[in-house]
Amino acid sequence: MSILAQIIGLACLLFWGFWLCCKLRLPAGFAPLCGLCFCMVVLQLAGSCNQLWLGVQLLLVGAVLTLAQRRRHEILPQLLSPGVLAFCSAAGVLMAVFAIRQPEFQTWDEFSHWGIYFKSVFYQHRFAVWDTTRSLAHQAYPQGLPGLYALFALPAAQYREADVLFVTALPLAAAASALFALPQVTARRPRIAYTVCACLAAPALFWLFAPDTPYTTAYMDAPVGALFAAALCVILLPCAANSRVQRGLALAFLCGALTTVKEIGTVFALCVVGIWFLQCLQDALRDKGGILRGFLLPFTAALPCFAIPLAWKLLLKALHRADDQFSSMGPGYFLQCWQEARTGFDRYFYDVWDRYYARLRSYPLLFGASTFKVGCLCAAAAVLLLIVLIWAMGRWQGLRAALPGLCMILYWPLYQGVLFYVYICGMSPYEALEMASWERYFCCFFLGWFSVLEGEALLAGFAAAHRLPRMAGHAVPAIVPCLLVCSTLWGIWQAGGAASLFCLPKADWRTEQQQIAADMLTRMDGAQNGSIWLLSADDSMAVQNMWYYQYELYPAVTAVEAQSSETDVDLGYNIGEHDVTWLVLFGVTDDFTARYADLADDGLRSAQSTAPALYAVTNVDGRIYLTAK
C-alpha cells in the first residue's frame, strides 16, 4: 500500500467523520472515530451481501461529495482540533515507522484466521465466508476490520502485512483522538500545550494493553478494547436535552462497529448500552419528565448490538459455514460440564475454575499487579474521581460524568464470569487449562476502563480550573495530559525502550519459510484453486504447518488437513475423500514410506533440509498416483 493509498483512506474516514459530527452534534475531535465506525458498519453489511467492492466505491464517492458541500473555513478549524491532530499524529507515526520497518505477522492466529480474512479481501474482493477456495479459517468471526482494509486496499498494488497492521491499529488511534477531544478547550485555556501533549501521547497511548505491542499484531483484542474505550468517551460528553436522539445514533454506530470486530465486542456493546440507559434515566429524572423517552432512547443504540450479529449468523448458516469451534458455546454444554464435575464423572469444570481463580489472584497483568489487584485499583480510582467530579462540576453533572467509571465496577465481576464461560465452552481443553490468551482478553477490558478514568480525570481537571486561582487554573488542565505522556513513555520503556517503538520486531524465521512457500508455488507450475494435504514427522508441528502454509500459498492453493506421519493415516482414502491435488511431506517415518511406496513411481522421499517433498496427486478411477515435483 503506497503512502498515497493510506492518505486516501484516512481522508475518506475524516470527511465522513466531519459530516457525521455535524449531523450528530459531536465535537470535531470525534470525527476520526465516527468516520471509522461508520465505514466499518457499512463495509461489514456490504461484505455480508457479497458487494464489498461496491461498498468501498460508494464510500469514496460519498466522501468526495461531503467534501464538496463544505466550505474551506469550516474544515480548517475541525482539522486543527486536538482530537483530530492526535489522530493524525498517531497515523503519521505509524505510516512512517511501518514504511521503514515493514513489520510482519508472527503468531498463530494471524496465519490461521485473520491473515486469511485480509488476503481474501485483497485477492478475492470479498469476505472469506464467500470464498470458493475452501479455506479452513474459522468463519464465525465478524469481519469489520477486514472490510475497512478494503477501503485502503482498493488503490494498493500489492498485499503487504504492514498495511494490514496499519489498518488494525487505526481503532487505537481513533480512541486516542476521542479521549483527547473530551475537554471543551477554549481560547483562555492552554490549548497549544494541551494539543502538543495529545499529539505526543496518542501514537503509543495504549502500549500497556498488549502482550507485545498493540500496533504489530493482527489480533482483534486491542481494536475491540479501543472501540469500547471510545464509546465510553462518547458517553462522557455532556448531552443537551435536544440532542439525545443524535447521541443515541452516534452510540448506535459505535456499538455496531464493536460487534463487527469480534464476537466479544457484542458484550462490550451491551455494556455501553447499559451505561447509556442509566444516563438517559438519570437525565429524565432530573428534568422531571420524559421518563418514557429515558427508557426507549437507549434502544437506538441497542438495535445494532443484536441486528448485526444476528444477520451475520444467518449468513453463516445460509452458506453452511456455521459449524466451527464456537458451535458448542450454548449454555447446554456449560451446564453439562458443571453437572459432570458435580457428580464426580469429570473434573474438567473444576480444574478450569481452579486455574482460572489462581491466575486471577496471582498472575501479574499490568504494573506487576495481579488481574484482581488492577481491578481493585481501578474501582478505587472511580470512586475518588466521583468525589472530585461532584466537587468540580456539581452533584448532578459530577454524578453523570462519573457514572461510566462506576458502572465498570459492576461490569468487572460480570466480565470475569463471561470469560470463564468462554474458557469452558469456546476453547479446547488444552487452551482452557493453560489459560491461553489471558492477557489479551483482560487487557481489552482494562483498556476501556483506563480510558474512561482518564477521560473523567481530563474533565475534572478542566472543570476544576474554574474554581482555582488564575495560575493554578492554567496548570491543572495540563496535569492529566502530562501524566498520560509519562505513562506512555513508561510503557514503552517497559516494552523494551525506544527500540520497541521504532524498531518493531520481525520474525527471523519468516524469511526462510516464505522462500520455501515460494519454491512450492514454483514447483506447482502456477496451480490455481488446488488443495494440499500436509504430513509432518513431528506431531507438534503438523497443525502449525497447515495453518502457516495455507496462509502463504493462499489463494493459489488451500490446505484441507494436516496430520503426523506417525499416525495410522489411510493416505489413499483421505486423498480421494478430500479431493486433494497436492501432497506435502515434512519428513516421514520409514514405516510410512514402506506402506505407500507403490503410490509413486520412485517411492516416497522425505523432506530435504531446504524444502518439503512435494507430490502432484492424480486420481484415476479411484486409483491414486503421486508424481514428485
What does each model-found stretch correspond to?
Residues M1-L79:
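Membrane-embedded, hydrophobic transmembrane alpha-helices
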Residues V41-G47, R247-E263, V267-G274:
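Membrane-interface alpha helices of multi-pass inner-membrane proteins
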Residues L67-Q78, F268-L303, A559:
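Perimembrane helix-loop-helix junctions
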Residues V93-Y194:
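Active-site lumenal/periplasmic loops and adjacent helix-entry segments of GT-C-fold
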Residues V485-M546:
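Membrane-embedded, lumen/periplasm-facing catalytic core of multi-pass transferases
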